[in-house]
Amino acid sequence: MKAEKLAAIIDSDFYTGVPDSQLKALCNYLMGTYGIDPKHHIIAANEGNCVALAAGYHLATGKIPVVYMQNSGEGNIINPVASLLNDKVYGIPMVFII
């Protein structure tokens, strides 16, 4: 699937992530479309920061954000996912591309 089609299906206007060679097509699409505009695309230092940024975006806008990462970054999202996204805490919806 092409990155443009994936983005159209997801229909989000906020992406944050840690670039990865396996996600090169998506990263290139996001850079070409949004660049590093903090209203739409933020490249973060680690995956846990991405989840926190996306959670803040949702709390501020009510919209569903997207987090992209390589599979080795899953361990870095455990704490923010368990605390911020849990339905008994804030119940924040989020799309993950791994």
Over which residues does each language-model region extend?
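Thiamine diphosphate
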Residues: 1-98
